[in-house]
């Protein structure tokens, strides 16, 4: 009976595979939104104010960071919790494949969230005249919460490894 439960629990890791595949569909949706934003800005490029162009570019950078985060979670999560990726030797491999454990994945995710939050905060500050001061305060508090959390996770990871 114990062996059955252990084998069933171990096999249940494959339930994560469609979730990671679903993230790739999310990446496709993000890609479509990215190009929608580009095609939206191109016809207006010469009439667009510099600040508005910077806001669009920050939005594109934000999407690129989220896309990278999705790829990182998808691939390393699959490798850590489902199965190793068997990529042909003649194919190009990402240099971090097979090297990112769940601890380093958490740190990369935390760093990505801080970067994404920073971009969002910069976009908010560029439009600060249209945002209530108490909202600005909360944006900064939330961002600092992400920064402190990422720092604390890194510190705890360092302390527990040594």
From Swiss-Prot:
Task: Write out the transmembrane intervals.
Answer: 15-35, 53-73, 109-129, 136-156
Q: Where in the cell is it found?
A: Cell membrane
Query: How does the protein associate with the membrane?
Result: Multi-pass membrane protein
Q: Which InterPro entries match?
A: UPF0114 (IPR005134), UPF0114_bac (IPR020761)
On whether Manganese is a keyword of this UniProt record, the answer is no
Pfam families attached to this UniProt entry: UPF0114 (PF03350)
Q: Which UniProt keywords apply?
A: Cell membrane, Membrane, Transmembrane, Transmembrane helix
Q: Classify the source by domain of life.
A: Bacteria
Q: Report the main location listed first in the record.
A: membrane
Q: Which GO terms describe its cellular component?
A: plasma membrane
Q: Which NCBIfam families match?
A: HI0507 (TIGR00645)
Q: Which HAMAP family match?
A: UPF0114
The record's comment on protein family reads:
Belongs to the UPF0114 family.
The protein's name in its UniProt record: UPF0114 protein Psyr_4257
Record organism: Pseudomonas syringae pv. syringae (strain B728a)
The lineage is: Bacteria, Pseudomonadati, Pseudomonadota, Gammaproteobacteria, Pseudomonadales
